[in-house]
Amino acid sequence: VSDTKKASDVFIECLEAEGCEYIFGVPGEENLDFLDSLGKSDKIKLILTRHEQGAGFMAATYGRHTGKTGVCVATLGPGATNFVTSAAYAQLGGMPMLMITGQKPIKKSKQGRFQIVDIVSLMEPVTKYSIQIAAGDNIPSRVREAYRLAEEEKPGATLIELPEDIAEEPTTDWKPLPKSVARRPSAEPKAVRAAVEAIEKAKSPIIVIGAGANRKMAGRMLEQLVEKTGIPFLTTQMGKGVIDERHPKFVGCAALSAGDFVHRAVEASDCIINVGHDVIEKPPFFMQDNGVTVIHVSTKTAEVDPVYFPQIEVIGDIGNAIWQIKEDVSPNRDWNFDHILAYHQAELEHTGKLADDARFPIFPPHLVKQVRECMPRDGIICLDNGVYKIWFARGYTAYLPNTVLLDNALATMGAGLPSAMMSAMLYPDRKVMAICGDGGFMMNSQEMETAGRLGLNLTVLILRDDAYGMIRWKQANMGFADFGLTYGNPDYVKYAESYGAHGHRVESS
């Protein structure tokens, strides 16, 4: 019977064939065959975490950094339900991830309904693909399909449920399916020509860089387009760092407030080149029928929206489309960017004063400046969610792509520390800082043990206000009484030391 293989062994071989390096998670009884097969692999390392959510955030961040699918594992029932937030984080944020979950036997007695939840159905709204393996022979095609869908634009989350009895059964069809080399389609030349004509005809074009442009090649092509044409650019929060923000044509990052400097700069333009727009982030402009041309450059056509109806769409691989536009466009001598760039100048003068305000307790713009000064060029900051995220999105100058990891999609709390841990694992020679509020940090602070066990080189900055500050701020803004949002905190210095980390309390600015 030498031509059969145990199904869980086949699963691991398929993951190896896909180039899987790590599996993050908390295995349970229903994963023990899978765990045994994983233990025999010399290519894949198990990273054991203290909560499934931390594992899911790490897997998603692996996908965000590398473009390859991050893999995580959990048991049935409560293990798998703990992945729901991680799945939504990856799905909305465009990060390729595969979750592998256990389940009770499906062919023989389940011993009642203990711990059984229909995880495949539960995950459908927050994944691109959610499937149960009902026969071991299906594993190679299911794994290949999960990877294909996770990584295809727009990337996202996938789930494969591997029941206990299927994991241990012998399979005959066990060869991993090879990846096909699929090139993404190029934009149609007529669409490119229409876009170029509109850009050349405009008086003050501007480029908006969104989440979809934050992929490997698009950044280089965008920089070349800006160099050739001199057209100013701004980013959304998820597009931050695609081009070095010290560039003289950088206008800012659109975060939160309409009517501010960045939005005024966009309003001064008559042609908006919107690159990699993702509806998850509202565009930093609201279209009116006022003669402003909007060009949508993306892998997919624009979703219908009363405030977003681009007149010209250039659909195809984004990097390639930008290259085609750059090759075709002739810079127009009559273009005038003074008005647009003046808003950026005004913003710099405005924030410069704030950043030098050394009051204590520390003032957020001052903190942003201090962090930027101490982080090297390729240093990575990983933001949890709170008011400080807006300050950093707007005020922290990103020099390289993926050096400011923030989540403006699901915008969950609790991902700051796990995303920093993943960054430190992938880039052990780079400085990594997790920047968390006290609320977000405590949601996954147990992963400090994991970070210590893995010997990760990272710093955690906790901004403590003893409250869910973002909501408290909005509560005050909306005229409500201050109620229901404050709490106490542990002594964070002792807390850090209890995990074997160094703890410091900042006593002055």
Predicted feature descriptions by range:
Residues 2, 174-175, 291-387, 503, ...:
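Phosphate/pyrophosphate-binding active-site segments
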Residues 4-93, 384:
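N-terminal cofactor/phosphate-binding cores enriched in small/glycine residues
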Residues 8-11, 16-18, 34-41, 345-429:
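Active-site diphosphate/adenylate-binding microenvironment
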Residues 100, 108-115, 305-307, 313-315, ...:
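Thiamine diphosphate
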